[in-house]
């Protein structure tokens, strides 16, 4: 290591300069969570000589900025005045200074922010510089940026909305105190606070004039995101739980928030509103506990042309299908549509269940196995063959149909499946001869 250091361009550096470094510099370095691969470099007085020897592309300045090491940044500047030939990983390039500023703002290192501004960084170059410190709650950095003239109200108070969404209560209060409008963009800040689930901010914004009555169903927003306390908050304010054809209940059901569903039903929400949308949407999204509750409340399982079971079959929710069937859902409707869609999607457990319950797997000219083959769902196809379907029947009509309709890669996979199943090359040859006529 010593021989390597002799040829290093930093050997000529005045050693007195190292010895004159403030002790707190090394304390900061030792206590900073910087990547272990350069810890030695950060704690050795031959710091930049070691950085020069590093083969990694580690950007020392970037790490120093991220970790708030203001002493390192000042040291780099001081070194540059003595020798500008040091490693590219320790150069303070003005072309990168704006990126460094963005990171310093994001991580809340006020001293670094001020230093970079002093070095020429333009704190007003991008309005988005505010986003990082606001969403991460770095209030002092935001105050400094505002004092430097950064526009905190751009895009109709976008920063206030960001703070509300992220739950930065103190930031919200500060922005309101210096002039942000809680009602901008049709009370959108309040909507974002509801979405984020921050009831303290919701209450504060309303106290400052945000009008929840001008929002398109604030209760539904809270239900959609599962924020029970905000649901109760708006119920206490006499918001109509049945507004927009019971949208609040539908949103809670679709997103699986059972406790909210029960709460709204207890308050009188209509489970069968809009063609029993609550059970339809909860079935489509796979929320078994909500489906079971709604069934116990006498929801119509066959509403809107058997929507609930159709979509459960499409998505592959076996438990929900069983629950619906046991509660009277029609599963043979529309020429055994449920079986056909499950076969094409490859949902083997559903296919088996429906066949065992009596679904006709040969309906519509054996549509189920044709759908399975064309979608390369060969486990389902094998099961249906075991149930009695024969691809060789009717001059191999099923096989010819699938080969004709499929892409070349799918054709090859179907051919392999047929050969593995019947071990008959002539079967394949005759099929191709027929479909190419």
UniProtKB/Swiss-Prot annotation:
Keywords: ANK repeat, Repeat. The keyword Calcium does not apply. It holds the Pfam family Ank_2. InterPro entries: Ankyrin_rpt, Ankyrin_rpt-contain_sf. The keyword Repeat applies. ANK repeats lie at residues 56-86, 96-125, 127-154, 156-184, 185-213, 214-243, 244-273, 275-303, 305-333, 334-363. It comes from the Viruses. This is Putative ankyrin repeat protein R787. It comes from Acanthamoeba polyphaga mimivirus (APMV).
